[in-house]
Amino acid sequence: MEPCRIRSVVFLASVLALAASAGLAEEAISVTVDATRIRQKLQHIELVVPVKPGPLTLYYPKWIPGEHGPDGPIANLTGLKFEADSKTIPWQRDLLDVFTFHLEIPHGVSHLNATYDYIEPDGVSATDKLLALEWNEVVLYPADIPAEKLTYEAKLLLPDGWKFGTALPVENESGNRVSFKPISLDLLVDSPVIAGEFYRTIDLTPPGEPIHHEIDIAADSADALNMSPENQKEMINLVAESGKLFGARHYRDYHFLLALSDHVAHFGLEHHESNNSRLPERTLLLPSSGMSLGGLLAHEFVHSWNGKFRRPADLTVPYYEQPMKTDLLWGYEGLTDYIGPMLAARSGLWTPDQYHEYLASIAAMLGPGRPGRTWRPLLDTAVGEPGLGFARGGWLNWRRGTDYYDEGDLLWLEVATIIHRESGGKKSIDDFCQEFHGGPNHGPEVKTYTFDELVKTLNAFAPFDWAGFFHTRLASTSAEAPVGGIESGGWKILFNDKPLKLEGRRGNPGDVYSVGLQVGSDGVVTDAIVGSPAFEAGVSSQMKIIGVNGRVYTQELLSDAIKSAKDASQPISLLVVVDGYFRTCTINYHGGARYPHLVRDSDRPDYLDELIKPHAAAQ
C-alpha cells in the first residue's frame, strides 16, 4: 500500500471531477416538456445535457423545498433512455438510492440526450382540462453542482387552445409552444406553471402598489372561473395587508396559481414569486369561497416571506439529493399558519367570527382531540416530518402528524400576546415581521436563520426568556391544548351544542368532541380518539359503521343519537364491520353534542380582535 500515492490519485480525481462539473455548469441544459397528451396523464420530456467523457451521475430531485421530505415522485418517471450521436448510452440506477442514475460518457461526446415520460397515474396535478406543472417532477440534473449554479432553458408544449400562467419570464410564444428565458435550476423548480382550456387571469394589484400581483386560474369548467367582485376585492386587500405587515416584498411580481378541480389533490405549495394551489372545482361559486381562499392562498402567499425568503438554515440545502433537517418547521410552517389566517381576517376573506371559530377548532383538536400530545411533543412532529408527517391509516390523534402547523399557530399567537405585554403595548407581531422579514427587494433570495437568531430578534422588541419559552412549549407533553395566546388575547374556549360555522375539515361534526369519532359520509372511521367513549367501546380507525341504534348509518343519524343520549339512559349502539366481521359497539355516553367556540373573557382586554383588524388603507 502506498498511502501518499493513493491520496494523490484521489485528490487528482476530485480535481478532475470538479473541473468537469464546472464545465457542465457553464452551458445551459435544455428541457422540453411536451404536455400535449396530458389528457392521457402523460408528459414527454426531452433533456439535453452538456457532458464530458467519463463517469456521469444524474439525479432526480428528491428533497423538494416546501415538502420537507424525500418525496420526489420518482415512481412516475418512466421510459428513460439516453443517447449521444444517435447511439444508446446504457444507464444504471444506484444500488442504494433510486433517485440516482450512473452513466459512462464515451470519448468525443459533448451532449447527452435524455428522453422520458412523466405519468400521472393518480391525476394529482392534471385533468382533462388543466395541468399544474412543477418542474422538479420533470427534470434531471448533474451531480456536484449546486442548483443555483445550473442554468436551464425550458420549453413547454401545451394542448391547442390552452392558456397558461407562471412567474417564469417568457422568451417567446409560438402557437402552443412556450420558450422561457434561461434560468437557474433552483428558480426553475421554484416557478410552477398552471395551464388549462378554461383559464382566467385577474389583476390583484392594490392602488399605488408598484409590484404587479395577479391570480391565474385554470378550472375544469368555464363557470368555475367566476370569482365574485367581493372575493376580488378581498384578495386585493390581502395583497395590501401583506405589504403593511411585512413592509417589504422579495419578488419581481407575484402569481397566485389556482387549479379548480374535483379530480386533483387539494393542497398548496409555496414559491418565492407564486404559489401552486388546488381547490375543488366550484370553490369560487360557493358562499364559503372567502373561507377557502383565505385558508389556503393566504398561507401560501405568506410563505414568500416566511419560508422562502427567511428560511431555517437546516432547511436550506444546495442540492435536491441532500437531506434537510426539519426541527424548525414550527417556525417555517407554524408562524406562516398563524400569519395566514390573521391576514385572511384583516383582508375580509374571513369574518372575525370565522377566525374565532377557526381558533376554537384547532384548540379543541389539540386538546381532547390529540391524546398523542401526552407522549409526543411539538418538536418531534417537526423533527419526524420527513418520515412520519403524512403517515396513512388513521390513528392521527395518537401518533400525531403535521401538528407543527396547528400547534405552531397557537404558539405564535401566544408570542404575539407576549410581545404586546412585555413591551407595554409599544410593539406588536407586526413590528417583529417587519424586522425579521423586511429589507430591500432583490427579487427571489434566501436569508437563512437559526433558533438563536430568531430568539435574538424577538428579544430586540420585547426582552423576555424567549429561549426558555420555546423550549418549554416545544417539549411539552401536556394533555391540554396550548391556549395561552387565546386567553391572553381576552378570550376562552367554551363547549356547547351549537355547531361550528365552518366548512371542510374544520367543520367536523360534534362526534369528535363528544363520543370521540371522526367518521366519513360512507361510515368509515378515519379516527377514534384514544381514551374517548367510542374508543373504550371498541371502535377503532378504519372500521366501518353500518348501523346506529338499529338503523342504517348516516351522519345525521349518528348526530341525532349523540344529541338524544343526553336525556336518555340507553347507550348508543353502533353496528360496525371490521375485517369482514360484524360487531356491536355500545357507547356509554350521555353528554350530548359538544362543539368548541371562543367566548369573550370580560376580565381581560380584547387584544385578539385588535390583531385581526384591517391595517392597510385599501379596504
What annotation goes with each model-predicted range?
Residues 1-6:
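N-terminal secretory signal peptides that target proteins for export/translocation
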Residues 9-20:
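Bacterial N-terminal signal peptides
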Residues 21-25:
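Sec/Tat signal peptide C-region and signal peptidase I cleavage site
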Residues 26-64:
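Early extracytoplasmic/domain-onset interaction patches
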Residues 36, 48-50, 65, 70-252, ...:
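Non-catalytic architectural context of zinc metalloproteases
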Residues 203-329:
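Juxtacatalytic substrate-recognition/specificity segment
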Residues 275-284, 309-310, 321-374:
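Post-HExxH zinc-binding segment in Zn-dependent metallohydrolases
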Residues 340-341, 350-619:
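C-terminal recognition in membrane/secretory proteostasis and scaffolding
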